[in-house]
Amino acid sequence: MQIQNNLFFCCYTVMSAIFKWLLLYSLPALCFLLGTQESESFHSKAEILVTLSQVIISPAGPHALTWTTHFSPSVIIILVPCWWHAVIVTQHPVANCYVTNHLNIQWLELKAGS
């Protein structure tokens, strides 16, 4: 049982590190897209995304990983590997980012949070 737990933890750690690297690698492109928009909310969102350089990863379900920042617990990123769908939730607008397998931004929409 201990071996299974260690193996699961090892696999989870490796998978988390890979997703974290891919997410951070995609941040410059995402920030560029957000920064080129006219709306102030896009610029503030880009600043929030930059703070994700320090993230902690925790499981959000069987098919998702959740990233929360040390700076603001209200900033949460949920990445669902099956659909490569990242949801960034803050106290302000919600950004839904649909991405490809390489985490290149394919579609981006900002809408008011409920």
Curated annotation (Swiss-Prot):
Q: Which residues cross the membrane?
A: 14-34, 75-95
- Where would you say this protein principally sits, based on its record? membrane
State its location(s).
Answer: Membrane
Q: Superkingdom of this entry's organism?
A: Eukaryota
Record key words, sorted: Membrane, Transmembrane, Transmembrane helix
The way it spans or sits in the membrane comes to: Multi-pass membrane protein
Record's GO cellular component terms: membrane
Q: What is this protein called?
A: Putative uncharacterized protein UNQ5815/PRO19632
Could you tell me which species this protein originates from? Homo sapiens (Human)
**Which classification does the entry list for the species?**
Eukaryota, Metazoa, Chordata, Craniata, Vertebrata
